Structure formats: structure tokens, C-alpha cells
Curated annotation (Swiss-Prot):
Belongs to the LTA synthase family. It is found in: Cell membrane. This is Lipoteichoic acid synthase-like YqgS. It is a multi-pass membrane protein. SUPFAM superfamilies: Alkaline phosphatase-like. The keyword Glycoprotein does not apply. Residues 1-4, 63-70, 138-153 are cytoplasmic. Proteolytically cleaved. GO terms for cellular component: extracellular region; membrane; plasma membrane. InterPro entries: Alkaline_phosphatase_core_sf, LtaS-like, OpgB/LTA_synthase_biosynth, Sulfatase_N.
Length: 638
């Protein structure tokens, strides 16, 4: 008796159903996907179906046992994709992208972080696979070796296409121009599924890879015009206030502003920093702007005054580009440049990217004495790191531009008992609980570092810049964070938690006349601010930041996810909030006035990176200079 089509595909349908339900369960339990109405919930529920129907449906072209084996193999592969995204999301609050997958040189260093992020319940992801294997081996009813016909396959894939276009049409009606919002990965996953997002991400990757080949010097014109029109005059009174001094940048790992001037159980969390900012320029309204590249993104932003990419890390995707980074600019003023970081040189592709930035030296893990006794978590403890770095810095040619990158205050925030100077917090989040002791330890290490600079004679002739690189506590811990701060963590408050410390200390100047600067800004403004203090004119440079000390600086900054902040409003997740009250605004005109600027800045910066446009900049300046001289000669002749 001829078997019906449904009996032929019964094993496949069971696999699709199990994977569909599993994916929806992962959506609801592992990802924080905001749902506003029943339509969005329905879209979230059905969106995995078209992909699963397609990928499992390819088994219809196979015969016999190979069909079931393919289905089981695909179940394993799709499950791995789910698990990889779950683990990545637990720390980064984001979904994997293709550029992130190329960061394989980072994997060996993740060690304890990945172990901490895995949970026993993750084993439940294998239940459906076990069921399929059992059915394949034990149940003959699911071992059909009768091939499907051409008509059956045609009807099946026509149904798959109809499901896909129904999903896409519903999503477009709910969120118009959905596929133009490539920066909003949560929105894409919510509407087209995690799996279709990865396919879309692959298309984007191919498109962006072609941008460099198609770019030419004319591509820079719009960018130059925008940068020139939006550049603000620097603070003339402070221009050159730190001229000729050494620059010591300290990247404070995972340090957010909420710990500054805050206490835990009656004890200050950052006693040294609390005192240090009273002798410095303290910028209390500055936000980190990093994307998936985290610490490497912060380095990129600070050195280049460009935005990081929305997908992956620039340090991996575009390390071979030509840049106009701070080390290269300062080289013209006689500066020697160096990075000091007790980690592997290949981590975040730093060895290659630092060459592109123009750094003279990179002191990596091989420059340090690292032992089991002086290490914890991700590597060398901060106190040891600063102690050994000070010795290395004494031998640098002066003036120098240096960056020191700390490690101890890194997830999962491990700390030896003898280094614990403050008790852990008590909440349901072990991550937040352990965060405070590592921040306190980092603060103590900073105190010792400043003392060492004074002992070594490097303090008086330096400008010291301390900045937080990115968040340490993700929104996965908002319940515990709300408990600590004593308020609900709304989307507005979540943006406020992206504030990071920025402290500029100039001995002999800021200690005599300290300031608290409340101008809204981001890490992108650090380079222009620093260059002005050093007396370096950057009018000819392409940069999106402005001097934070300037009275003309616009109170505005945009985060990599498209959120933006002004002195009046905060925009995030499609909603506009009053900056003072944190309440949503019914009238969104105040946000609309800045929305285009936010999108344009991110887009233009992306064009520079993907097109490697700065390779044309020096030649373009020479061409423009020649044209000006030619015009002057013609004017004189006439």
C-alpha cells in the first residue's frame, strides 16, 4: 500500500515541532525580548517555523536512513546555534554575529567566563535530540525509505514560502522598514527569528565586504562636510594646558559610574577615586559607546573618535584599514606611544590593530612576570600590573602617549580572599554580589599606581586620564541592580547605567582648580578633549567627537544600539524619555530633532570603516591643497 505523504515525513514533522517549541522556550527564558502586544507575541511564536520547515525539509531530497540521519544532524546543529547564542547573551546581552565568530583567537582566554555562563539546565536542550534518536532506532514506523515525489516536494516548499512571507508581512506591518534596522538585533530576532537573523547577518557581511572594493575618494565628501559642519571650537582658555606632557590613559575594566561616591554596608566602594576626582576634571555625564567589541571597541573609540561597528569588533573585521589614530597624530609632535596590557598579544587582534594605529610598542603578557600567585581570573592582578607597568614606563622615551588596560574587574569578578577589601553584596545575582569587591580592589590598585608615579618622577609632567571601558553588569541582573539602587530599572534607567567614569587629572592645574563637567558626552569625545589640552590642532582630522571642556559642545551622545542622550531627553527602545524625570514623553518632537543626527553619525562612521575611506584622506587633502594654490596663482595673475 502506497504511503501517504504525511506518513513519509512524520519523523521530520516531529523534529520540526520539538525544535519549534524548544526555540520558543529559549526565547522566553533566555533572551530578554520586549513584547508590547499580542501581535508581537504571535510573531515571536511563529517566526522560527519557516526556517525550520526549510532546513529540515531538505531531507526530502534524501532516501532511506540518510533522511533521518540528516534530520538528527540538523537538530544537533540548530541546538548548538541556540546554545551558543544563549551563552553569549548571558554576558553580552546580545546575539552572535558572523564577525564575532571570527574572533577565535579570543576563545582560549575566555576560560572561566564560559564555564560560569553555562548552566545545568542547558542540558535540557538535548532532550528532543534524544527523543529523535530513540524514535529512529526503536520505532520502525519512523524509518520510511520511500522517497517523496517531485509534486510532493514542490507543494511542501510552496507551503514553506507562504509561511515565510506571511511572517515577514506581519512583521513589516508591525514594524515598517524592519530590514533597514540592522543595528537593532533584538528587533530582528523578535520579528524574523534567531535563525533567519543569522542568514540576514550573512547577507550583510557579504554586502559590507564589497564596500571597500567599491569605495573611492569621492565617498569622503559627504563625511567631510558633516564633520566640518558639526565641529565645535575647542576651549581656547585651556588649549595647550598640558602641552608637552606625557599621557597616561588607564582603561578601567567594566567600571560603571554608579559605584562612584557610593557606599556598600557603610563603606565607600571607590574611596580613592572619590578623592581623586576632587582634584581633577570630573566628567559625570559620559557614556560608553561600545558594541560587541567591548574593551577593544573602547580603545578604538578613544584613539580614533569614530564609532565602533554595530556587528563584531573593528579590531577583527578591519585591522588592516588605514586610520588617523591618536598615536599617529601625536607622533608629529614628538610623542612615543605604547600600550601596556598583561594579556596575549593576539587577544582582540591587538598586535595587528596597534600597528594600524601607529603605536611604537606593545608590552603584552611576555613583558610581565605572571605567576599563579599574582594572577586571578583573567590574568595578572591590577596591583601587580601597575607595579610592573610603572617599571616599564620609566624607560619610555618622553613625551609618551600610553594606555594601560586593567584586568581584575572582569567578569566573572573572581578575587582572592586576601585581596577582598569590602564584603560582597547580598542579592540573587552572584555577578553583582562579586562585582563590588573587584571594583574596590581596582580602586586600591589605582591609589598605589598614582603613588608609584610620584615616586618614579612621572607624575608631575603627565596628564592622567581614567575612563571606564564598558558596562560590567548587564541588564540580566536588573532585579538585583534595582535592589541595590533602590529603584526599578526601567529602559530609561538602563541607559543611565551606561555612564562610565571619565577623569582627567593634570598635576599643578586640576588640583588647584578642579571642575565637575556635566556636559553630555561619550567616549568619542575623549580624543578631541585630550588633544585640545595638549595643544594639538585637530581641525583637519575626521572625528565625530568634540571637546567636552568647550562651552559650544552640544549636549548629545549616541550609543551603538541607536539610543541617544541629550540634556533634555533620552531615546531608547523606540521611546522618548524626559531626562530629568525619567518618564516617557507622549510628545516625541524633542527626540525626533536628534534622531536623524544619531542615525547619520553611526552610518557615516560605518562607511569610513567598511570602505577604508581614510586611505584616501591624505591624498584628498593634497589634491585640495594643490587646487587652492592653483586658484591663488590664477587670482594673482588676473
Amino acid at each position: 500500500m502506497r504511503k501517504t505523504f504525511f506518513s513519509k515525513i512524520s519523523f521530520m514533522l516531529i523534529a520540526i515541532l520539538l525544535m519549534w517549541l524548544k526555540t520558543y522556550a529559549v526565547y522566553k527564558t533566555s533572551f530578554h525580548i520586549k513584547i508590547d502586544n499580542l501581535t508581537q507575541e504571535f510573531i515571536l511564536f511563529i517566526n522560527p517555523l519557516s526556517f525550520l520547515l526549510l532546513i529540515f525539509g531538505l531531507s526530502l531530497f534524501l532516501k532511506g536512513k540518510n533522511r533521518n540521519r540528516y534530520i538528527i544532524a540538523m537538530s544537533c546543529l540548530v541546538t548548538f546555534v541556540l546554545l551558543a547564542n544563549m551563552v553569549f547573551y548571558r554576558f553580552y546581552n546580545d546575539f552572535l554575529t558572523i564577525p564575532v565568530l571570527f574572533q577565535t583567537s579570543n576563545m582560549g582566554d575566555l576560560g572561566s567566563s564560559i564555564g560560569t555562563l553555562l548552566e545545568p539546565t542547558d542540558l535540557l536542550l538535548a532532550v528532543d535530540i534524544a527523543v529523535l534518536i530513540w524514535l529512529h532506532i526503536r520505532q520502525k514506523a519512523f524509518q520510511s525509505d520511500i522517497p517523496s515525489t517531485k509534486n510532493e516536494r514542490a507543494a511542501y516548499f510552496l507551503f514553506v514560502a507562504s509561511v515565510y512571507f506571511f511572517n515577514l508581512g506581519l512583521s513589516e506591518a508591525e514594524r515598517p522598514q524592519l530590514l533597514t534596522r540592522s543595528f537593532d538585533r533584538e528587533m530582528l530576532v523578535k520579528n524574523i527569528s534567531l535563525f533567519n537573523f543569522h542568514i540576514y547577518d550573512g547577507v550583510l557581511q557579504s554586502k559590507q565586504s564589497a564596500q571597500r572594493a567599491l569605495a573611492d575618494s569621492n565617498s569622503l565628501t559627504e563625511i567631510e562636510n558633516y564633520v566640518t559642519a558639526n565641529a565645535k571650537d575647542a576651549n581656547k582658555r585651556l588649549f595647550g594646558a598640558a602641552k608637552g606632557r606625557n599621557v597616561i590613559l588607564v582603561s578601567l575594566e567594566s567600571t560603571q559610574s554608579f559605584v562612584i561616591n557610593e557606599k556598600l554596608n557603610g563603606e565607600e566602594i571607590t574611596p580613592f577615586l572619590n578623592d581623586f576626582i576632587k582634584q581633577s576634571y570630573n566628567f559625570n555625564n559620559v557614556y560608553h559607546q561600545t558594541g560587541q567589541g567591548k574593551t577593544s571597541d573602547s580603545e578604538f573609540i578613544v584613539d580614533n573618535s569614530l564609532y565602533p561597528l554595530g556587528r563584531g569588533a573593528v579590531f577583527f573585521t578591519n585591522a588592516g584599514n588605514q586610520y588617523m589614530a591618536a598615536p599617529e597624530i601625536l607622533k608629529n609632535s614628538g610623542y612615543y606611544s605604547a600600550v601596556l596590557h598583561a594579556n596575549n598579544k593576539s587577544f582582540w587582534n591587538r598586535d595587528l590593530m596597534y600597528d594600524s594605529f601607529g603605536y611604537d610598542s606593545f608590552f603584552d603578557i611576555n613583558s610581565y612576570d605572571v605567576t599563579d600567585e599574582n594572577s586571578v581570573g583573567w590574568g595578572l592582578k591590577d596591583k601587580e600590573f601597575f607595579e610592573q607597568s610603572s617599571e616599564l614606563m620609566k624607560n619610555l622615551p618622553q613625551p609618551f602617549y600610553s594606555r594601560l588596560i586593567t584586568l581584575t574587574n572582569h567578569f566573572p569578578f573572581d578575587l582572592d580572599e586576601e585581596d577582598q577589601l569590602i564584603d560582597e553584596y547580598d542579592s540573587n545575582s552572584q555577578t553583582l554580589n562579586k562585582y563590588f569587591p573587584t571594583v574596590r580592589y581596582q580602586d586600591e590598585a589605582l591609589k598605589r599606581f598614582i603613588e608609584k608615579l610620584k615616586e618614579d618622577g612621572l607624575y608631575d609632567n603627565s596628564v592622567i586620564v581614567l575612563y571606564g571601558d564598558h558596562y560590567g553588569i548587564s541588564e540580566n541582573h536588573n532585579e538585583a541592580m534595582g535592589q541595590f539602587l533602590g529603584k526599578e530599572i526601567t529602559p530609561f534607567e538602563e541607559v543611565q547605567l551606561q555612564k562610565v567614569p571619565l577623569v582627567i587629572h593634570i598635576p599643578g592645574i586640576t588640583d588647584k582648580k578642579p571642575q565637575t563637567i556635566e556636559t553630555v558626552g561619550g567616549q568619542i569625545d575623549i580624543r578631541p578633549t585630550l588633544m585640545n589640552l595638549l595643544g594639538i590642532d585637530t581641525k583637519d582630522q575626521i572625528q565625530f567627537g568634540n571637546d567636552l571642556l568647550s562651552d559650544e559642545k552640544l549636549d548629545f551622545t549616541v550609543l551603538r544600539d541607536g539610543s541617544f542622550i541629550t540634556d533634555q531627553v533620552v531615546y531608547t527602545d523606540g521611546a522618548c524619555y524626559d531626562k530629568e524625570t525619567g518618564k516617557p514623553l507622549e510628545e516625541t518632537k524633542q527626540c525626533e530633532a536628534f534622531a536623524d543626527k544619531a542615525k547619520q553619525e553611526l552610518s557615516l562612521s560605518d562607511e569610513i570603516i567598511y570602505g577604508d575611506l581614510l586611505r584616501f584622506y591624505d591624498q584628498k587633502r593634497l589634491d585640495n591643497s594643490s587646487k587652492r594654490k592653483e586658484k591663488q596663482m590664477l587670482d594673482q595673475a588676473s
